[in-house]
Amino acid sequence: IANVSIPAISGDLGVAPNQGTWVITSFGVANAISLPLTGWLTQRFGQVRIFLASVLLFVLASFLCGLAPTLGTLIAFRVLQGFVAGPMIPLSQTLLLSTYPLRQSGTALAFWSMTTLIAPVVGPLAGGWITDNIGWPWIFFINVPVGLIAAFATWTLYRRRETPTR
């Protein structure tokens, strides 16, 4: 969603577009660093706790990204956002599979996969529209209500289910 907004972000923050690409790079690098830590974190703190912490910290980081007054602060908040987003993908699959019986796991993952296939198509379209009609900060602010709803739903469904920790 942020890729198509780089020219607007760069212009508003008074930097060159090639500097603005750090908004994307910083997220990706931080995400790649945190992803392998997911297994260790879940063994230490539990799957539900880590997933909820990831979602809520992602919401906070998204809000801060929308408020960022400079490219440097935006990049710092994107690093945080990317780092806390790492566990969300594998843990969303793990929690989903724990909800369905083994014989329905293929169906559950098929529905999950549909969202991951639709997002890269809808994201840039939505990001472009939001940036053009509302403003680039809203590509980050839009994550706040969605993330809060996801955190509430996760807590409601899984608060009694937690994996053993070491």
Annotated model-derived regions:
Residues 1-38, 88:
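Extracytoplasmic
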Residues 35-166:
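Helix-loop-helix hairpins in multi-pass membrane proteins, especially solute transporters
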